Amino acid sequence: MKKILFAASECVPFIKTGGLADVVGSLPKCFDKRYFDVRVIIPKYLCMSKEYTDKMEYIDNFYMDIGNDNKYVGVFKMEYEGVIFYFIDNEFYFSGAKPYGDLLWDLEKFIYFSKAVLSALPVIGFQPDLIHCHDWQTGLIPVFLKERFHNGDFFRNMKSVMTIHNLKFQGVWDVDTVRTLSGLPDYFFTPDKLEAYKDGNLLKGGLVFADAITTVSNTYAEEIKMPFYGEGLDGLLRARANDLRGIVNGIDYDEYNPATDKFIVKQYNARDFRKEKVKNKLALQEELGLEKDEKKMMIGIVSRLTDQKGFDLIAYIMDELCQDNVQIVILGTGEERYENMFRHFDWKYANKVSANIYYSEALSHKIYAASDAFLMPSLFEPCGLSQLMALHYGTLPIVRETGGLKDTVEPYNEYESTGTGFSFTNYNAHEMLACIRNAERIYYDKKREWNKMVDRAMAADFSWHVSALKYQELYDWLIG
């Protein structure tokens, strides 16, 4: 039995701000229980829902030296859907209204968390063969493991894996502050260890000291070795290329399943989508005040409204696109200029564009079910989950070929009748518009071809079980 511990800053269903929480919450329950004992450890935030905190059972507490201080560490435990979760409790650090705040404060609390995770293991009596760390918040775990803990028998052969969910966030502050907060000796603050461009960098520490590095898609694993995507760490990632692999995220098919989805008006599956899916479109057109027309192509967008997601491209061609015979439904929040741009087009083309500048889980499900196509022209996209949801709902993605989008959406080839979506290569607004118009042409002129693509899209398997098998291979390789 191999014992694995996931360490992260957030996890579904306890606390969520982004895709990281989905991975940490969904992946552990998909491992083969006969060979893998996978548990999770996260901070016990005060802002967690009471329905979970009331069920947590107190295990123990102790005091730990960190920096120049001696800090309280409480440990709680709870079983959820067959997986054991541990929680590190300290109200001084984890009492805010949301999990992240000011960067310097985040830095201090996650340095504390990284050390507390290792210090708590002997107390809870769980001795993992491998600790799987996620993003910069747990970047110091591999460092502490090598520096402070490897002398004792308990930690001697413990391995670590570092997973990059988004390389843009690295946990960077000046060297003196990081040295003081972490209590690490000067030896660790050199350019081949934690120092990057004269600053202390927590993620870099994890990438240098972990036994293996993974990221959330094959293409992204290749891209981050180049300066454009490497965020200043491309040299290190090239040096560690043999230990770096990409494993695509999955989605939870229990939650995102058009056949059982409780948010949508008409449930459907791969056999009956030809006549049932359109009922969701008519219902959404009515709900959002768009022109009711089941034949009109609907393009959905569910996203954070930021540059990373390609909204500068959409801004360039939105007026042109609105001349076409399409409807566009947007859901999300983000940069003010993009929020206002969509509000403007909602006003200008009231029966064609619906801008919903907020976030609603229910509406997102309705958009996945009602739309014919799903637009996602990202500048970079480590994995992306929206296109996987769209595929499963039979809504064909229109994407830029980058990161996980390139790995998961097979572009349509009209000569071979293959593909599950449409893609373009260069980050260029009119290349994107040409791609959208190609999709319109197939939708209006070759509806049978379109429906065959929907068949292939709904049959594609991006469940967590597929990802879990790849992680099991990685663990076998590391632990032996």
Task: Name each model feature, range by range.
Residues 1-480:
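Catalytic cores of nucleotide-sugar-dependent glycosyltransferases that transfer UDP/GDP/TDP-activated
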